[in-house]
Regions:
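Extracytoplasmic substrate-binding proteins
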Residues: 35, 42-108, 192, 201-223
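Short, solvent-exposed loop/beta-turn-alpha elements that line the ligand-binding surface or hinge
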Residues: 1-10, 133-141, 186, 203-204
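Structured C-terminal subdomain patch of bacterial secreted/periplasmic proteins
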Residues: 156-223
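Ligand-binding pocket segment of bilobal, Venus flytrap-like solute-binding proteins
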Residues: 140-165
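Proline-aspartate-enriched helix->loop->beta-strand connector
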Residues: 22-28, 44, 150, 154-158
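Alpha-helical, coiled-coil/dimerization segments enriched in small aliphatic residues
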Residues: 113-143
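A short, structured surface patch at a secondary-structure boundary
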Residues: 1-20, 31
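Solvent-exposed loop/turn segments at secondary-structure junctions
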Residues: 12, 25, 32-34, 51-54, ...
């Protein structure tokens, strides 16, 4: 769209393009955090990335700050209240059913598992799923696992983020998971492998609309 200026990609910012816009304020997310000093040379800069390990508290802080910044405090509070109500409803359903989950990312044929202390902590800490594996390495990129992992760690749900759907690389996660080993698992037999909207879960977490969609996806899965 011609009305928007291209200022780079998710990983590489075109600082000359940013400077040409002569901004009064620059708001960045987690992917640009390491370049914050370069942004500050252009204009005052704030990092409003949401912390996945403490998603809701971080989300509320960010939305509240944005409400103050743009004189939309009432709208910000309303959005937070509505999302908290939705989370409480899903959390209640999940807890009543005693559901467990594994959260994984498919990336060019590899599978990585993520814990409650990871970027996908909302599923555990907010929406109430119990971790089936409490010994996952909490690195940024998760812990690489094989499909046999799901035979040993039997969760009620497996939530899959397909990085390849965002980057355009690798086989689709749904095809990757359709294999002899995975098809032996109860989670596959029960139809509880859930392929999440990867654009949102991988690149757009933290927004009001994206958070609503994230919660709705999980709510639909556990109806």
């Amino acid at each position: 769209d011609d009305k928007y200026t291209n200022v780079g990609s998710l990983k590489e910012t075109d600082f000359e393009a940013v400077e040409s816009l002569n901004p009064d304020l620059i708001i960045i997310g987690g992917r640009q955090a390491e370049d914050i000093d370069s942004f500050k040379e252009i204009a005052p800069t704030v990092n409003l990335a949401v912390d996945g390990q403490d998603y809701m508290n971080s989300f509320k802080t960010v939305v509240t700050d944005l409400g103050k910044l743009f004189d939309k405090e009432d709208e910000a509070k309303k959005a937070i209240d509505e999302i908290e109500a939705k989370i409480e409803k899903v959390n209640k359903t999940v807890k009543e059913k005693g559901l467990t989950a594994s959260v994984v990312m498919a990336n060019e044929g590899n599978i990585s598992a993520f814990s409650a202390k990871s970027r996908y902590g909302l599923i555990y800490n907010g929406l109430g799923f119990a971790e089936v594996d409490k010994n996952i390495d909490d690195s940024t990129h998760g812990q690489q696992v094989s499909f046999e992992y799901f035979l040993e760690n039997k969760s009620d749900y497996v939530f899959v983020v397909d990085r390849g759907a965002v980057t355009g690389k690798g086989e689709a996660a749904s095809k990757l998971f359709d294999n002899e080993v995975m098809n032996k698992t109860e989670v596959a037999k029960n139809g509880n492998i859930v392929y999440l909207n990867s654009v949102i879960w991988y690149t757009m977490t933290g927004g009001i609309e994206s958070t609503n969609q994230m919660i709705d996806e999980i709510a639909d899965a556990v109806k």
